[in-house]
Every structure is written in structure tokens, then in C-alpha cells.
Regions:
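Conserved catalytic core of the tyrosine transesterase superfamily
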Residues: 1-219
Length: 219
């Protein structure tokens, strides 16, 4: 909300639909006063807002869609994501939960997606390990995950972040019926094990929607 109010103040207009030139000038203004991760978050908020207006048919076309935004990305090791980028990705995903037009099914899948991303980066586990996680190996009360790696070697991971645990608990509550019919913890919309390919596609899709210009590939 603060990000949208700031955009409104900058444009000095009350109309919902701004010209692409106004948006372009606003983005340049953001680059002058904020760090890159803050600029990305504010742009993501604006993109989510106009996406909502399109879905509600309040506007026909999002004015921000064709506005090019370029960032000098942080240098990172292959297959890793800098913290600032991860923060922006999750910020965008959480902002989608606030949209008033979310259906029950959409909210359910969104909570699953956020739980997957939070777990991947809170634990650092491989995507294959996450997709194969059995429910019996997860203790959300203690925040402990038991991961079986190569050679059936077990390792224990502790999640100490309250936000991550709360998101996992919310996911578990919403998917209780499906979870009672399988051993796996992360499921697809049909109640089956969430596949590695689907998880990678999901992360890539949100990264593109949030205008992250990195090749986001959790290992």
C-alpha cells in the first residue's frame, strides 16, 4: 500500500491508468533514491496492482507491461540467488495473497507455492529432496526437518524463522484432506507428489512476474 501511495504522490494524478512515460519517469526516480532491491519491490507492487485491475476488467491493458526495466544484477555463483533477489521474489508472492479477487483454489495453490519457496531457501535442500519429503520427517512444532540424502544418510535441519513455520502450518491446514491420503508433504493440485519439474517452473514463473531478470534455478 505504501508503495502505491508513493507512486500516486509522484504522479500527482488521481487517475488509475497512468501513461507509460509517467511510469518510466517514476522508475528512474526510484533508481535515484533507493537501492536496487527496494526499487524492484516497488515495481513488483505496481505490477501486481495493475495485474489485479486487469483481472477485474477495471482497465483493458496494464501500462507497466511494456515498460522496460533494466537492473545491474549482483554477481552470484551459479545456481544461487542473492538474498536481495529472494527477498523481492517472496515479497511479490506474499503481495498476491492480498488481492481481493483470489479464489479459494488460487489461494490454496499460492500458499503451497510460498511454502515451497520458503522451505527451499530456509533450508538449502535440493529441490528433489523437497519434493520427496515425507510428512513423517517434518516436525513443524519444533521446526525440524529430517532429510535423507545419498546413500540414505540422514541429516537434520532446523528452521528458526517464525514466518516460514507459520506459512508451512497454513499450507498443512489448507491441504489437510489431500495430505491424509499420501505420505508426501508437498503436493500438486491433484493431491499427488509435487514434481521437481513443476517446482522449477513455478519458481521461474513467479520470478518473471516479479520482473527478476535472473535465471532462477534452485538446485
Amino acid at each position: 500500500r505504501i508503495d502505491l501511495e508513493q507512486f500516486s504522490d509522484f504522479s500527482e494524478q488521481e487517475e488509475i491508468v497512468m501513461s507509460r512515460e509517467v511510469i518510466r519517469q517514476y522508475i528512474l526516480h526510484l533508481h535515484d533514491i533507493y537501492k536496487q532491491k527496494t526499487v524492484k519491490r516497488k515495481i513488483a507492487s505496481l505490477k501486481a496492482f495493475y495485474s489485479y485491475l486487469e483481472e477485474e476488467e477495471i482497465i483493458e491493458d496494464s501500462p507497466i507491461r511494456k515498460v522496460r526495466t533494466e537492473f545491474r544484477e549482483e554477481k552470484v555463483l551459479p545456481r544461487t540467488i542473492p538474498y536481495s533477489t529472494l527477498e523481492m521474489l517472496l515479497s511479490y508472492m506474499y503481495s498476491l495473497k492480498l488481492q481481493e479477487n483470489n479464489t479459494e483454489c488460487r489461494t490454496k495453490l499460492l500458499n503451497r507455492d510460498i511454502a515451497v519457496v520458503e522451505t527451499l531457501f530456509a533450508t538449502g535442500i535440493r529441490i528433489s529432496e523437497l519434493c520427496n519429503l515425507p510428512q513423517k520427517n517434518i516436525d513443524l512444532e519444533q521446526g525440524i526437518f529430517c532429510i535423507k540424502g545419498k546413500g540414505n544418510k540422514e541429516r537434520y535441519l532446523q528452521i528458526g524463522t517464525v514466518q516460514v513455520l507459520e506459512q508451512l502450518q497454513e499450507y498443512k491446514r489448507q491441504w489437510e484432506i489431500e495430505l491424509n491420503q499420501t505420505e508426501f508433504f508437498f503436493l500438486n493440485r491433484f493431491g499427488e507428489r509435487y514434481s521437481e519439474q513443476a517446482a522449477r517452473r513455478m519458481v521461474k514463473r513467479y520470478a518473471e512476474l516479479a520482473m527478476i531478470n535472473l535465471h532462477v534455478t534452485p538446485h
